[in-house]
């Protein structure tokens, strides 16, 4: 049993040597050690961690926020906050519920707040790549943009040691997030909304032209000519990343989000939605140039994804650079001895990663993603809000699965954007992506009736099948939902690696939520309650 205390502070951080220092919100065990991103917490499988979260934030937020979207607003000032361990299985009272917020010194708290110390059982399967971040109602986009996010690893030595993966200095976290800055170094966030008569400040997506990695703008990382493990997290508010190396160096994907694949998959590029993690092996010994050389990690995803503005080759099209050491030559000093398999990827994998069959009695649900626009003209229409099944977070729960069961959700995207769907507690994976035929007619009917059967979904869900990428065929905590598609996902309300029930009461109050992880969408109001039943 381990006990830790972490707090949130306001601090100043240098994102680039040519920029003024930037005020940020940070996590840390003290102000002196706090950073953006926050400290990476390393836990052990099946060893509980007890964390007391403290709020030492100032009286006012450092970024603008919009009180016209559902928001935690304390009566006596202060910045509300609550921590969600994203991708973990924990009891509802430790999940970071949106209404479980609290202000500095616990002076005020939300309606579902009950305790200062959270219990993290650490029972989800390896590879254990998860992260923690703020989750206060209506403030996720502002508070994560301000800096309240960090990586969390659950190690499982008995499972992972035979894989002989790169470790220590050869195991790197890359926490990627886009930002926009004012000339004085402060983070820029719009103060005027897309439809100010409805929401004075809220914008449907935040995009910054500066790409930061581990708190630095366009950084450099020195690497040797050997294998590295890169745990890549897209911690951007809304930006998708389609990353590749400038010299074509491949990624060997071993895990996606918290779970290993059934076998490694080698790809030339990776598409990461916000909140998505890929765990990859990169072999820098494959770099052809024998001299010390730089290779760039590039991004080509348009924003919003998939049909928005192309990435700028000199700004958001660049992520970082890797400084690859010179190749060892006869007569040079002998390099550090490397393990014999340093350029070999083992055939690691876990047998429970892929869904192989769907039980015929599986409960089926239909989840519909809506975008409420100012008009029907695609050239002038502005987004006012977004909903799931036409409902708000405050509306009664309609997704009430039985704890320990598995369900099939058909997620129908009637918006022009790709949405990263995130479920708290549960793990899930896409098994089919089916294109809608004549989606405008179906959407028009759904906006009137909000009923998939009355609108003849079976006559529209007959288009092309898009294959689920091999690197995403495992149990995930974020699944990409493309526009004008029905994406079918298998959702497990149990521990997938051993088929056991949760070691806590997942049916307790205040329950869980599921939502789009484009933070601006989540805040207004693409989020719904998820209540498990006994």
Curated annotation (Swiss-Prot):
Protein purpose: Multicopper oxidase that may play a role in the maintenance of inorganic phosphate homeostasis.
Chain positions recorded as Cu cation 4 binding sites: 419, 516, 521, 526
Induction field: Induced by phosphate or potassium deficiency.
Glycosylation, residue list: 109, 234, 291, 312, 323, 341, 372, 450
Protein species of origin: Oryza sativa subsp. japonica
Domain Plastocyanin-like: 219-291
Biological processes annotated in GO: cellular response to phosphate starvation
Gene Ontology cellular-component annotations: endoplasmic reticulum membrane
Family: Belongs to the multicopper oxidase family.
Tissue: Expressed in roots and basal stems.
Protein name (Swiss-Prot/TrEMBL): Multicopper oxidase LPR1 homolog 3
MF (Gene Ontology): copper ion binding; oxidoreductase activity
Binding site for Cu cation 3: 135, 424, 515
Compartments, as annotated in UniProt: Endoplasmic reticulum membrane
Keywords assigned: Copper, Endoplasmic reticulum, Glycoprotein, Membrane, Metal-binding, Oxidoreductase, Signal
CDD domains in the record: CuRO_1_BOD_CotA_like (cd13844), CuRO_2_CotA_like (cd13868)
EC number from the UniProt entry: 1.-.-.-
Main location: endoplasmic reticulum
Sites where the protein binds Cu cation 1: 84, 422
Bound cofactor: record note: Binds 4 Cu cations per monomer. The Cu cations are bound as 3 distinct Cu centers known as type 1 or blue, type 2 or normal, and type 3 or coupled binuclear.
Pfam families documented for this protein: Cu-oxidase, Cu-oxidase_2, Cu-oxidase_3
Cofactors named for this entry: Cu cation
Binding site residues for Cu cation 2: 86, 133, 517
């Amino acid at each position: 049993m381990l006990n830790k205390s972490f707090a949130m502070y306001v601090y100043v951080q240098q994102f680039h040597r040519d920029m003024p220092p930037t005020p940020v919100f940070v996590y840390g065990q003290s102000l002196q050690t706090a950073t953006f991103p926050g400290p990476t917490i390393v836990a052990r499988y099946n060893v509980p961690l007890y964390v007391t979260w403290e709020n030492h934030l100032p009286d006012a937020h450092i970024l603008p926020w919009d009180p016209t979207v559902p928001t935690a607003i304390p009566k006596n000032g202060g910045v509300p906050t609550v921590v969600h361990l994203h991708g973990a299985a924990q009891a509802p009272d430790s999940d970071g519920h949106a209404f479980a917020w609290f202000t500095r010194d616990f002076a005020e708290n939300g309606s579902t707040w009950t305790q200062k110390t959270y219990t993290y059982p650490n029972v989800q399967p390896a590879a254990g790549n998860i992260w923690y971040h703020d989750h206060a109602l209506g403030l996720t986009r502002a508070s994560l943009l301000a800096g309240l996010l960090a990586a969390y690893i659950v190690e499982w030595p008995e499972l992972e040691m035979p894989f002989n993966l790169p470790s220590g200095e050869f195991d790197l976290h890359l926490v990627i997030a886009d930002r926009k800055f004012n000339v004085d170094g402060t983070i820029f966030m719009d103060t005027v909304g897309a439809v100010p008569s409805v929401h004075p400040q809220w914008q449907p997506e935040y995009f910054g032209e500066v790409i930061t990695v581990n708190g630095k703008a366009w950084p450099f990382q020195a690497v040797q000519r050997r294998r590295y493990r890169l745990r890549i997290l897209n911690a951007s508010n809304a930006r998708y990343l389609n990353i590749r190396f400038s010299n074509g160096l491949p990624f060997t994907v071993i895990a996606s989000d918290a779970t290993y694949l059934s076998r490694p998959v080698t790809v030339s590029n990776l598409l990461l939605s916000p909140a998505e993690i890929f765990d990859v092996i990169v072999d820098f010994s494959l770099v052809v140039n024998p001299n010390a050389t730089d290779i760039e990690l590039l991004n080509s995803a348009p924003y919003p994804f998939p049909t928005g503005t192309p990435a700028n080759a000199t700004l958001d099209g660049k992520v970082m650079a890797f400084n690859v050491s010179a190749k060892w030559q006869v007569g040079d000093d002998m390099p550090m001895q490397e393990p014999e398999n340093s350029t070999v990827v083992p055939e690691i994998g876990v047998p429970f990663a892929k869904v192989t069959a769907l039980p015929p009695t599986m409960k089926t649900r239909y989840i519909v993603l809506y975008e409420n626009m100012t008009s029907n003209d695609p050239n002038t229409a502005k987004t006012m809000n977004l909903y799931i099944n036409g409902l708000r977070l405050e509306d009664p729960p309609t997704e009430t699965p039985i704890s320990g069961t598995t369900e099939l959700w058909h997620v129908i995207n009637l918006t022009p954007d790709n949405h990263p769907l995130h479920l708290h507690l549960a793990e899930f994976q896409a098994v089919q992506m089916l294109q809608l035929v004549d989606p405008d007619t179906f959407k028009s009917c759904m906006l009137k009736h909000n009923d998939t059967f009355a609108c003849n979904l079976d006559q529209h869900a007959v288009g092309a099948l898009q294959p689920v990428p091999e690197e995403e065929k495992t149990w995930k905590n974020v699944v990409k939902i493309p526009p004008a598609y029905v994406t079918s996902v298998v959702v497990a309300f149990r521990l997938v690696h051993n088929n056991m029930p949760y070691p806590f009461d997942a049916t307790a109050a205040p329950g869980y939520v599921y939502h789009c992880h484009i933070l601006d969408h989540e805040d207004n109001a693409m989020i719904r309650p998820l209540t498990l039943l006994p």
